[in-house]
């Protein structure tokens, strides 16, 4: 979720058109681009239901679903009133590389099967119970970024995107082995690794044996890779994550004559709210 969102020091919000945080969702209209030039107009509460159903497992604890709803509402309010090149005629779109995930109720029901009635009610309750609630900083909606799971701690925004954002600092996150695919492995054939890396980092020297390609690793406060020396060149963990489709930048790496293997923990950019962390906190009774 929101993998491409990169906060800047000055939040890009038109403060003259932000909807008051305590408005009733049903009174707010959202224009949603669903592709092929089609734009739907939905009340905010109906839109939020579709976002939360797509962004977080409905099996999660009610308080986690509420947290996701507040994040989704805040994110949406921050988008409203801004002109975005990808969807100039709409406030938001359904492309997860630009905005938030989105699913129609009938598709959600197909996914949920016999749990449809319970899950529909849970998400409806999360939206209703947080009606109008948004996270603000200096009176305006924050950039409410989130991701799937952390490796014990979230990451400061400055350590991932290079811009310090006061409310996006690292905190402990209690999820762990209960998270599906919490640990993952990506094995890249040596020739594919060389071709892919050199296209991005042409100054890297990969002429020697693969076992000697990797040097010093610098890690951030959450244990993720800030940078690693590859063939004598410093490469960011985020760049390696993108190049080789790793689930996160929290990884170790080994190499032999046949493959470069990444052992990865967690999923996502690591900044903001961890969804599985929120669920773990909810199970502890946190609200």
Where are these regions (language model features)?
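Conserved, single-site charged/polar hotspot
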Residues: 1-287
């Amino acid at each position: 979720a929101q993998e491409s969102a990169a906060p800047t020091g000055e939040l890009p919000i038109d403060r003259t058109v932000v909807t008051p945080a305590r408005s009733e969702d049903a009174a707010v209209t959202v224009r949603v681009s669903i592709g092929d030039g089609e734009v739907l107009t939905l009340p905010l509460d109906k839109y939020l239901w579709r976002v939360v159903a797509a962004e977080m497992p409905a099996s999660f604890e009610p308080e986690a679903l509420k947290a996701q709803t507040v994040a989704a509402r805040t994110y949406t309010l921050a988008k409203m009133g801004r002109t975005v090149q990808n969807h100039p005629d709409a406030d938001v779109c359904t492309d997860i590389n630009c905005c938030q995930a989105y699913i129609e109720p009938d598709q959600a029901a197909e996914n949920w099967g016999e749990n449809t009635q319970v899950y529909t009610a849970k998400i409806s309750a999360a939206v209703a119970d947080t009606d109008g609630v948004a996270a603000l900083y200096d009176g305006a909606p924050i950039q409410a970024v989130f991701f799937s799971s952390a490796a014990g701690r979230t990451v400061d925004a400055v350590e991932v995107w290079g811009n310090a954002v006061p409310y996006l600092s690292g905190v402990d996150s209690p999820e762990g082995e209960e998270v599906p695919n919490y640990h993952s492995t990506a094995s890249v054939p040596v020739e594919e690794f060389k071709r892919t890396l050199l296209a991005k980092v042409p100054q890297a020297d990969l002429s020697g044996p693969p076992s000697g390609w990797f040097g010093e690793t610098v890690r951030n406060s959450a244990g993720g890779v800030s940078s690693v020396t590859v063939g004598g060149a410093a490469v960011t963990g985020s760049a390696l994550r993108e190049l080789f489709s790793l689930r996160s930048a929290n990884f170790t790496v080994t190499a032999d004559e046949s493959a470069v293997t990444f052992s990865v923990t967690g999923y996502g950019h690591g900044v903001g709210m961890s969804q599985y962390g929120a669920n773990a906190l909810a199970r502890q009774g946190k609200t």
